């Protein structure tokens, strides 16, 4: 796929904004340090064609973006270090990168089921990290026009500034302004609300921040002298219909007194089971599942509407593979128990635990966290991922623009609201071949 860049602009806030250094909470610092990639796809429908004018007009989008950056001013800043070396946000108004491009030989249909492959990654501007954390924009955007008339909006958002909920709050507010609608909820920019207690008093061991289990099998002899190349990975996406999800639930105990499991717990148990079987994990192999949970409503008192930052706490069910690959009910019970534990007391304890750690960077999750035998499964089902209507209609798809690590997966809702859920996942290529056969075998 050939992409021609029409032009790129650094868009600054439309008005003067506060010149401050924004303190980051521990939750803002235990996230991956790169830009989180996501991509929206839009089809040019009859209504947009009849309206006339320029579809996804760059000038209109830039004006709205500049307006949005006034209340969301940290987005226009740069990362910096305070005197103790802690990462903070320098709200200096230097702006966000906005790129316009064409893919004259491609159509929206060419992306098929929108699996987060390298083709999707090319729809997002590349960030150069070589000159230090203050050298690059916190937010990079690219509007790519296809020959079919459709458009992709690629988003790269530095994770220190926002989690999924806050990131979408910004994107959807920008879209509202672009179609002439005022921002519904203004951002609340004060991260001290998720500061640890004084003095910190963690009341749980917080297994979520403990090292991930390693494979029980010993390293092969050659690994002692030379580091082997990591096995090739594959990325795919699988759509489970409402009927599929119903058939999964039918495997669980029913009737009076039967335990209740969330849809996430049921689907996560199925994905964890399939991945463990595809990986050939022995029954005694410990495996950990990382489940991102939003703390906004879990913390008491709850955070203000529009709280802008990271409020992700992680539930981490841990079990031997034999339990995970057994009945669906066993896996779902393990997951639901971990999720139910995530109340305000647990979350406050997690903040205190993080405050006592000498080096938060040691807790940042990465390839070492999610790789075999472990798994990360992040749900975007409750996020408003399809609400970005810039004035030319809602997206037909929104999802990750890439999956950085083997063993990481995302659950996505359907844009049509048909009750289906899609699982985008990265696994070792040989494991993916088996996973493809298992995911619909129930």
Swiss-Prot record:
Keywords: Acyltransferase, Transferase. Its EC number is 2.3.1.-. The keyword Glycoprotein does not apply. Disulfide bonds: none annotated. The active site is at residues 159, 389. Pfam families: Transferase (PF02458). Expressed in roots and leaves. Expressed at low levels in stems and seeds. InterPro entries: CAT-like_dom_sf, Plant_Fungal_Acyltransferase. It comes from the Eukaryota. One of its GO terms (molecular function) is acyltransferase activity, transferring groups other than amino-acyl groups. Belongs to the plant acyltransferase family. Hydroxycinnamoyl transferase that catalyzes the transfer of an acyl from p-coumaryol-CoA to various acyl acceptors. Can use feruloyl-CoA and caffeoyl-CoA as acyl donors. This is Hydroxycinnamoyltransferase 2. It comes from Oryza sativa subsp. japonica. The gene is HCT2.
